[in-house]
């Protein structure tokens, strides 16, 4: 049996921009993608802590060091600049492997700076 497990998350990211007219996605600073092990074009869930909204989209790379978390396309209606969000990815694995699996968790602080990564 395969279980769907959390692969990685960016916890308490701050939305820096929302662009309704840009083709869908969430732009994430390449440093943050690397820290979490999230790949460009990987499916992500975005959980808006500020409003409770949840949506699925895909990640694209924003310039390294920019601290950008930018929600694009239709999903931009579900966030506003300065909202706090969690970005989560998942993977599937056998139940036996899942018992000993540890996801990557990147905790962010003000300015989308990495506070802790594990």
From Swiss-Prot:
Catalytic function, reaction form: L-aspartate + H(+) = beta-alanine + CO2
The keyword Lyase is annotated on this UniProt entry: yes
Location in the cell: Cytoplasm
Residues noted as binding substrate in the record, renumbered to the chain: 57, 73-75
Top-level taxon of the source organism: Bacteria
PTM characteristics: Is synthesized initially as an inactive proenzyme, which is activated by self-cleavage at a specific serine bond to produce a beta-subunit with a hydroxyl group at its C-terminus and an alpha-subunit with a pyruvoyl group at its N-terminus.
Free-text remark on how the cofactor is bound: Binds 1 pyruvoyl group covalently per subunit.
PANTHER family for this protein: ASPARTATE 1-DECARBOXYLASE
Protein name: Aspartate 1-decarboxylase
Originating species: Caulobacter sp. (strain K31)
